[in-house]
Amino acid sequence: MSQMLSPDMTIAAEAVTKAKIEVKNLNFYYGQSKALKDITLSLPERSVTAFIGPSGCGKSTLLRVFNRIYELYPKQTAEGQVLLDGQNVLDRSQDLNLLRTKIGMVFQKPTPFPMSIYENIAFGVRLYEKISKAEMDGRVEQALKRAALWTEVKDKLNASGLSLSGGQQQRLCIARTVAVKPEVILLDEPASALDPLSTAKIEELIDELQADYTIVIVTHNMQQAARVSKQTAFMYLGELVEFDRTEKIFTSPREKRTQDYITGRFG
Protein backbone atom coordinates (compact mmCIF):
# COMPACT_ATOMS: atom_id res chain seq x y z
CA MET A 1 0.00 0.00 0.00
CA SER A 2 1.44 3.38 -0.99
CA GLN A 3 2.16 6.12 1.51
CA MET A 4 0.02 9.27 1.59
CA LEU A 5 2.06 12.02 -0.04
CA SER A 6 1.69 15.59 1.18
CA PRO A 7 3.87 18.56 0.23
CA ASP A 8 7.05 19.11 2.22
CA MET A 9 6.49 19.89 5.89
CA THR A 10 8.01 23.33 5.47
CA ILE A 11 4.61 24.39 4.16
CA ALA A 12 2.65 25.77 7.09
CA ALA A 13 1.16 22.88 9.01
CA GLU A 14 -2.39 24.11 8.64
CA ALA A 15 -2.10 24.17 4.84
CA VAL A 16 -1.15 20.50 4.83
CA THR A 17 -3.71 19.27 7.35
CA LYS A 18 -6.64 21.08 5.73
CA ALA A 19 -6.82 18.72 2.79
CA LYS A 20 -9.62 19.51 0.36
CA ILE A 21 -9.08 16.44 -1.80
CA GLU A 22 -7.47 13.20 -0.66
CA VAL A 23 -6.71 10.50 -3.21
CA LYS A 24 -6.16 7.03 -1.77
CA ASN A 25 -4.90 4.01 -3.71
CA LEU A 26 -6.55 5.16 -6.94
CA ASN A 27 -6.38 2.96 -10.02
CA PHE A 28 -8.00 3.85 -13.33
CA TYR A 29 -8.67 1.74 -16.40
CA TYR A 30 -9.45 2.39 -20.04
CA GLY A 31 -11.03 -0.97 -20.74
CA GLN A 32 -8.39 -3.45 -19.57
CA SER A 33 -5.54 -0.94 -19.81
CA LYS A 34 -4.39 0.49 -16.48
CA ALA A 35 -3.84 4.24 -16.85
CA LEU A 36 -3.38 5.24 -13.19
CA LYS A 37 -1.45 3.04 -10.78
CA ASP A 38 -2.13 3.24 -7.04
CA ILE A 39 -2.17 7.04 -6.81
CA THR A 40 -2.20 8.48 -3.29
CA LEU A 41 -1.86 12.19 -2.51
CA SER A 42 -3.46 14.99 -0.51
CA LEU A 43 -4.30 18.40 -1.99
CA PRO A 44 -4.58 21.39 0.37
CA GLU A 45 -7.57 23.69 0.15
CA ARG A 46 -7.43 27.21 -1.28
CA SER A 47 -4.17 26.59 -3.04
CA VAL A 48 -2.98 25.83 -6.57
CA THR A 49 -1.62 22.36 -7.32
CA ALA A 50 -0.06 21.60 -10.71
CA PHE A 51 0.12 18.19 -12.38
CA ILE A 52 3.05 17.91 -14.80
CA GLY A 53 4.52 15.10 -16.86
CA PRO A 54 4.93 13.96 -20.48
CA SER A 55 1.96 13.27 -22.73
CA GLY A 56 0.14 10.10 -21.74
CA CYS A 57 1.43 10.11 -18.15
CA GLY A 58 -2.09 10.22 -16.67
CA LYS A 59 -2.31 13.79 -15.41
CA SER A 60 -5.48 14.70 -17.33
CA THR A 61 -6.97 11.31 -16.50
CA LEU A 62 -6.42 11.97 -12.80
CA LEU A 63 -8.02 15.39 -13.11
CA ARG A 64 -11.13 13.90 -14.75
CA VAL A 65 -11.57 11.38 -11.96
CA PHE A 66 -12.13 14.16 -9.43
CA ASN A 67 -15.56 15.08 -10.81
CA ARG A 68 -16.19 11.72 -12.51
CA ILE A 69 -16.49 13.28 -15.94
CA TYR A 70 -14.87 10.13 -17.32
CA GLU A 71 -18.25 8.45 -16.87
CA LEU A 72 -19.46 10.26 -19.99
CA TYR A 73 -17.37 7.74 -21.94
CA PRO A 74 -17.72 3.94 -22.12
CA LYS A 75 -15.43 1.34 -20.54
CA GLN A 76 -13.64 3.72 -18.17
CA THR A 77 -13.52 2.73 -14.50
CA ALA A 78 -11.91 3.98 -11.30
CA GLU A 79 -11.05 2.03 -8.15
CA GLY A 80 -9.97 3.45 -4.80
CA GLN A 81 -11.02 6.62 -3.05
CA VAL A 82 -11.18 10.30 -3.93
CA LEU A 83 -12.32 12.17 -0.83
CA LEU A 84 -13.78 15.67 -1.07
CA ASP A 85 -13.97 17.01 2.48
CA GLY A 86 -13.91 13.40 3.65
CA GLN A 87 -16.70 12.17 1.34
CA ASN A 88 -15.79 9.64 -1.35
CA VAL A 89 -16.82 11.08 -4.72
CA LEU A 90 -16.49 7.62 -6.29
CA ASP A 91 -19.33 6.29 -4.13
CA ARG A 92 -22.10 5.12 -6.47
CA SER A 93 -24.69 7.01 -4.42
CA GLN A 94 -23.07 10.35 -5.24
CA ASP A 95 -25.30 12.89 -6.99
CA LEU A 96 -23.17 13.68 -10.06
CA ASN A 97 -24.90 16.97 -10.80
CA LEU A 98 -24.21 18.17 -7.27
CA LEU A 99 -20.64 16.87 -7.46
CA ARG A 100 -20.02 18.82 -10.67
CA THR A 101 -21.26 22.03 -9.11
CA LYS A 102 -18.79 21.53 -6.27
CA ILE A 103 -15.96 20.58 -8.64
CA GLY A 104 -16.03 22.72 -11.77
CA MET A 105 -13.88 22.16 -14.84
CA VAL A 106 -12.36 24.30 -17.58
CA PHE A 107 -10.98 22.54 -20.64
CA GLN A 108 -8.03 23.08 -22.95
CA LYS A 109 -10.10 24.58 -25.76
CA PRO A 110 -12.55 27.35 -24.84
CA THR A 111 -16.09 25.94 -24.93
CA PRO A 112 -18.57 28.82 -24.74
CA PHE A 113 -22.18 27.89 -25.38
CA PRO A 114 -23.71 29.19 -28.66
CA MET A 115 -25.71 31.81 -26.79
CA SER A 116 -25.23 35.30 -25.37
CA ILE A 117 -22.50 36.18 -22.91
CA TYR A 118 -25.18 36.69 -20.25
CA GLU A 119 -26.84 33.35 -20.96
CA ASN A 120 -23.50 31.54 -20.90
CA ILE A 121 -23.35 32.43 -17.21
CA ALA A 122 -27.06 32.24 -16.35
CA PHE A 123 -27.70 28.87 -18.02
CA GLY A 124 -25.73 26.82 -15.50
CA VAL A 125 -27.07 28.75 -12.52
CA ARG A 126 -30.67 28.05 -13.60
CA LEU A 127 -30.00 24.32 -13.62
CA TYR A 128 -29.39 24.33 -9.88
CA GLU A 129 -31.07 27.43 -8.46
CA LYS A 130 -34.28 29.40 -8.80
CA ILE A 131 -33.40 33.05 -8.33
CA SER A 132 -34.95 36.35 -9.38
CA LYS A 133 -33.90 38.35 -12.44
CA ALA A 134 -32.20 40.91 -10.20
CA GLU A 135 -30.33 38.17 -8.36
CA MET A 136 -29.30 36.60 -11.66
CA ASP A 137 -28.06 39.93 -12.97
CA GLY A 138 -25.92 40.25 -9.86
CA ARG A 139 -24.64 36.69 -10.16
CA VAL A 140 -23.65 37.23 -13.80
CA GLU A 141 -21.86 40.47 -12.99
CA GLN A 142 -20.06 38.93 -10.02
CA ALA A 143 -18.91 35.91 -12.05
CA LEU A 144 -17.63 38.06 -14.90
CA LYS A 145 -15.78 40.26 -12.43
CA ARG A 146 -14.20 37.22 -10.78
CA ALA A 147 -13.01 36.14 -14.23
CA ALA A 148 -11.60 39.61 -14.97
CA LEU A 149 -13.95 39.96 -17.94
CA TRP A 150 -16.67 42.35 -16.75
CA THR A 151 -15.11 45.62 -17.94
CA GLU A 152 -14.59 44.14 -21.42
CA VAL A 153 -18.14 42.83 -21.92
CA LYS A 154 -20.46 44.81 -19.61
CA ASP A 155 -21.85 46.82 -22.53
CA LYS A 156 -22.44 43.81 -24.79
CA LEU A 157 -23.89 41.10 -22.56
CA ASN A 158 -26.38 40.16 -25.29
CA ALA A 159 -23.61 39.51 -27.82
CA SER A 160 -22.75 35.90 -28.60
CA GLY A 161 -20.13 34.28 -26.43
CA LEU A 162 -18.65 32.98 -29.67
CA SER A 163 -17.91 36.56 -30.78
CA LEU A 164 -15.24 36.95 -28.10
CA SER A 165 -11.52 36.39 -28.64
CA GLY A 166 -9.99 33.07 -27.61
CA GLY A 167 -8.65 34.47 -24.36
CA GLN A 168 -11.96 36.14 -23.56
CA GLN A 169 -13.82 32.92 -24.33
CA GLN A 170 -11.63 31.02 -21.87
CA ARG A 171 -12.28 33.62 -19.18
CA LEU A 172 -15.99 33.35 -19.97
CA CYS A 173 -15.73 29.60 -19.34
CA ILE A 174 -14.04 30.33 -16.01
CA ALA A 175 -16.81 32.81 -15.16
CA ARG A 176 -19.40 30.17 -16.06
CA THR A 177 -17.67 27.75 -13.70
CA VAL A 178 -17.41 30.26 -10.86
CA ALA A 179 -21.08 31.29 -11.20
CA VAL A 180 -22.39 28.01 -9.76
CA LYS A 181 -20.25 28.52 -6.64
CA PRO A 182 -17.86 25.55 -6.80
CA GLU A 183 -15.35 24.66 -4.11
CA VAL A 184 -12.76 23.21 -6.51
CA ILE A 185 -11.79 24.35 -10.01
CA LEU A 186 -10.06 21.91 -12.36
CA LEU A 187 -8.07 23.46 -15.22
CA ASP A 188 -6.97 21.13 -18.03
CA GLU A 189 -4.29 22.98 -20.03
CA PRO A 190 -6.38 26.19 -19.86
CA ALA A 191 -3.89 28.41 -21.68
CA SER A 192 -2.31 26.03 -24.19
CA ALA A 193 -4.37 27.40 -27.10
CA LEU A 194 -3.92 31.06 -26.15
CA ASP A 195 -1.45 33.79 -27.09
CA PRO A 196 1.11 34.99 -24.50
CA LEU A 197 -0.94 38.04 -23.44
CA SER A 198 -4.09 35.97 -22.89
CA THR A 199 -2.03 33.34 -21.07
CA ALA A 200 -0.68 35.99 -18.70
CA LYS A 201 -4.25 37.12 -17.93
CA ILE A 202 -5.31 33.53 -17.18
CA GLU A 203 -2.31 33.03 -14.88
CA GLU A 204 -3.05 36.29 -13.05
CA LEU A 205 -6.66 35.16 -12.67
CA ILE A 206 -5.58 31.79 -11.23
CA ASP A 207 -3.47 33.59 -8.66
CA GLU A 208 -6.47 35.71 -7.60
CA LEU A 209 -8.95 32.82 -7.50
CA GLN A 210 -6.89 30.64 -5.17
CA ALA A 211 -7.92 32.85 -2.24
CA ASP A 212 -11.41 31.32 -2.49
CA TYR A 213 -11.04 28.06 -4.40
CA THR A 214 -8.94 24.92 -4.44
CA ILE A 215 -7.41 24.86 -7.92
CA VAL A 216 -5.81 21.95 -9.75
CA ILE A 217 -4.12 22.67 -13.08
CA VAL A 218 -2.74 20.26 -15.66
CA THR A 219 -0.05 21.83 -17.81
CA HIS A 220 2.69 20.81 -20.23
CA ASN A 221 4.30 24.19 -19.61
CA MET A 222 6.71 23.74 -16.71
CA GLN A 223 7.38 27.47 -16.50
CA GLN A 224 3.66 27.98 -16.05
CA ALA A 225 3.52 25.37 -13.30
CA ALA A 226 6.40 27.12 -11.55
CA ARG A 227 4.67 30.50 -11.83
CA VAL A 228 1.14 29.64 -10.69
CA SER A 229 1.29 26.67 -8.31
CA LYS A 230 2.28 26.10 -4.70
CA GLN A 231 2.48 22.30 -5.02
CA THR A 232 3.47 20.22 -8.03
CA ALA A 233 2.92 16.55 -8.75
CA PHE A 234 5.13 14.89 -11.37
CA MET A 235 3.55 11.89 -13.07
CA TYR A 236 5.08 9.33 -15.41
CA LEU A 237 3.47 6.31 -17.08
CA GLY A 238 0.44 6.42 -14.79
CA GLU A 239 2.47 6.67 -11.59
CA LEU A 240 2.87 9.55 -9.16
CA VAL A 241 6.65 9.91 -9.06
CA GLU A 242 6.96 12.93 -6.78
CA PHE A 243 4.74 15.48 -5.05
CA ASP A 244 6.14 18.44 -3.15
CA ARG A 245 6.34 22.20 -2.89
CA THR A 246 6.70 23.61 -6.38
CA GLU A 247 9.93 25.39 -5.52
CA LYS A 248 11.45 22.15 -4.27
CA ILE A 249 10.29 20.14 -7.29
CA PHE A 250 12.00 22.59 -9.64
CA THR A 251 15.18 23.24 -7.64
CA SER A 252 15.96 20.07 -5.69
CA PRO A 253 13.72 17.14 -6.62
CA ARG A 254 14.21 13.88 -4.74
CA GLU A 255 13.67 11.60 -7.74
CA LYS A 256 16.04 11.29 -10.70
CA ARG A 257 13.09 10.90 -13.09
CA THR A 258 11.73 14.24 -11.92
CA GLN A 259 15.06 15.94 -12.46
CA ASP A 260 15.46 14.36 -15.89
CA TYR A 261 12.02 15.61 -16.92
CA ILE A 262 12.34 19.18 -15.70
CA THR A 263 15.81 19.51 -17.25
CA GLY A 264 14.51 18.33 -20.62
CA ARG A 265 16.22 14.93 -20.78
CA PHE A 266 12.91 13.39 -21.77
CA GLY A 267 9.32 14.48 -22.29
From Swiss-Prot:
It is found in: Cell inner membrane. Signal peptide: none annotated. One of its GO terms (molecular function) is ATP hydrolysis activity. ATP binds at residues 53-60. Keywords: ATP-binding, Cell inner membrane, Cell membrane, Membrane, Nucleotide-binding, Phosphate transport, Translocase, Transport. Residues 21-262 form the ABC transporter domain. It catalyses: phosphate(out) + ATP + H2O = ADP + 2 phosphate(in) + H(+). It is a peripheral membrane protein. Pfam families: ABC_tran. Belongs to the ABC transporter superfamily. Phosphate importer (TC 3.A.1.7) family. NCBIfam families: 3a0107s01c2 (TIGR00972). Part of the ABC transporter complex PstSACB involved in phosphate import. Responsible for energy coupling to the transport system. This is Phosphate import ATP-binding protein PstB. It comes from Mesorhizobium japonicum (strain LMG 29417 / CECT 9101 / MAFF 303099) (Mesorhizobium loti (strain MAFF 303099)).
